[in-house]
Amino acid sequence: MVSIKPFRAVRPNSYDVDQIASLPYDVVSKSEVLKLVEDNPKSFLNIDRTDVRFETEDADEVYELAKDKLADFMDKGWLIKEEEPALYIYRLLQGDRLQYGLVTTIAVADYADGHIKRHEFTRPDKEKDRIRHNDCSDANTSPIFLTMRKNSKLKFLLKKERDARLPLYSFDSFNDTNHCIWRITDPATIENIQS
């Protein structure tokens, strides 16, 4: 089984979450990003796609600006750092399509040891870009998505957590998608989910 751990997230405050939410960095063109960040200074693309402001996409300045933009968002209170480690339940609702996920950290060793199967082949230049971006900003700004086999126990635990509290966020964003997120901080519950 893959090891998962809670983490201290840097996340949007509740008031700005719908403005900060953005499309994944790799599904929008340079011209689309420029328009989106011009129209919305709170868009997370201001951090995730700083390359659009430079002639050379992999210049050191690209990654330094990402680090500076992340600090600026935090200084302005648009992004806040969690006090304690947490797991997050993430629900996406688009039309009649409903998906649930668990936001967590995983061990790279689980991938190296074959416990996580590769589902796509990524371009080495894009991998290098994201590694530099994460290293320089000291943040994972582009999480990866994993899928897993059906797990009735986990499904039950996550439903119980959703039913026990109001979500941290519930907002509509791009593509008519509703995003709903619950935070789990109770150590016993986290341990139960990890098992």
Where are these regions (language model features)?
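A cross-family signal for N-terminal binding/gating loops and helix N-caps
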Residues: 1-194
